Amino acid sequence: MLLLLLGWPGAVGAAGQSRHFTTSDGVRLHYIEAGTGPRTLVFVPGWSMPAWIFERQVASLSREFRVVALDPRSQGQSEIARAGHDHVRRAGDIAELVARLGPRPVVVVGWSLGVLDTLAYVRLHGDGQVAALVLIDNSVGEEPPPPPPAQPMKPGPKLPREVMMKNFVRGMFATRQPDAWLERLTQAALRTPEEVARQLLAYPVPRTWWREAVYSTSRPVLYMVRPKWTGQAENLRDKHPSAEVALLSNAVGHALFVDDPAGFEARLRDFLRRRVWP
């Protein structure tokens, strides 16, 4: 009954404990934490998304690891910040969270825009506190560039933001998700102000900056992507001595850890067991 009320697709309801910290520029950030022990996973979500989109992973993986999921500034339950919606400040937010979590290196798991935030963290703050990187379904600046949209925007009246966000959220999944859960996710995404959302899609660096970032680390890297990123994945695998790739099918959508949580977690556990914490 609880699962039905929450509208959650096959996982527990409120996984983990809510925690907060204040950044060096005075912004109160929220994160979810579950599990204990010396092995810590830090999940960083995508554009406008809340930390609880990883709720299934927090519940499952916290049986073995300490698991943290961040609400980036102006997302989820974090404070709507007046500034800092760029790669430099958001990288600093991750660095300050990692420092707060303790002295042992962590595995940072970035999804979508969280891939770029994670790469910015490594490039600007180094990988001294990083045990490994897991980069999910976004460009890492390798060749070839991202393909153009399959369906270019048609001229005409702009859709209301609420409609656009609803379509965006539903488009992240290849499998059917409960309507109540999708509506909850849409409302969470709409909490990010429109101007902030625009800024987050316009980080002022060339795409080669991200390539240099991923090659700046010698830590193990798992690049888990759908077919649209096959070219970048193959180049990264061939050129980066510490990288490996997991090429998924189009049976999963952009939020592949929601569409196939068991498969995602199995791949992640295998990587951690072989490359990070044998």
In which residue ranges do the predicted regions lie?
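Conserved HGGG/HGGXW glycine-rich cap/lid loop of the alpha/beta-hydrolase fold
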Residues: 27, 32-80
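Conserved hydrolase catalytic core segment
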Residues: 104-144
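Conserved alpha/beta-hydrolase catalytic His-Asp/Glu region
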Residues: 144-148, 156-215
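Active-site loop/oxyanion-hole signature of alpha/beta-hydrolase fold enzymes
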Residues: 24-25, 32, 69-109, 113, ...
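Catalytic histidine-centered segment of alpha/beta-hydrolase-like enzymes
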Residues: 252-265
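Glycine-rich His-Gly loop
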Residues: 43-46, 112, 226
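Alpha/beta-hydrolase fold catalytic core
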Residues: 1-41, 63-65, 102-104, 183, ...
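Conserved serine/cysteine hydrolase catalytic core
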Residues: 194-248
